[in-house]
Amino acid sequence: MKRTYQPSKIKRKRTHGFRARMATVGGCKVLARRRSKGRLQLTV
């Protein structure tokens, strides 16, 4: 049985990256929350 986490930089960026977040309403809300909280790193 293989492990569930198979790291891939491309997949990581495409699903959790900044542009992926900006593409949806929910993603924009995520970024807004993280900005208001003062996170230094908004996305991956």
Curated annotation (Swiss-Prot):
Keywords: Ribonucleoprotein, Ribosomal protein. Pfam families: Ribosomal_L34. GO terms for cellular component: ribonucleoprotein complex; ribosome. It comes from the Bacteria. GO terms for molecular function: structural constituent of ribosome. GO terms for biological process: translation. PROSITE patterns: RIBOSOMAL_L34. Belongs to the bacterial ribosomal protein bL34 family. NCBIfam families: rpmH_bact. PANTHER family: LARGE RIBOSOMAL SUBUNIT PROTEIN BL34M, MITOCHONDRIAL RIBOSOMAL PROTEIN 34 FAMILY MEMBER. This is Large ribosomal subunit protein bL34.
